[in-house]
Amino acid sequence: MDEKKNEIILFENQGVKLEVNLKDETVWLTQEQMSKLFGKAKSTINEHIKNVYKEGELIEKETMTKFGNSEFADKPTNYYNLDMIISVGYRVKSQNGILFRKWATSVLKDYMLKGYAINQKRLEYLEKTI
């Protein structure tokens, strides 16, 4: 992931606050960020990701990218795209997972019934920056 072409948006909901990387028309999260999002241990998120790949639901080279070196890590960090975030969200068993599934289902329902879905907060933010 190229840092210079990477937009970061702030996601905040139900006490969860994340800086989300937005690039190539998708969002990218680390396992640590997914752990916070879904309220589960990083090891649980890792296990779900492994199973998604093992079961052939998604392809690793299409859903994961390595990005940067931090002062705390010897190697780049793995980032996973929205396809993986959704797959993990439908597998994880937690209160945050339930909220995520309800949100994802409502967005899908809007697309199916209305033909579109609107992220009102994002739209308002973009209007302020123009």
Predicted regions and their residues:
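Positively charged, aromatic-accented nucleic-acid-binding surfaces
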Residues: 1-31, 37, 69-130
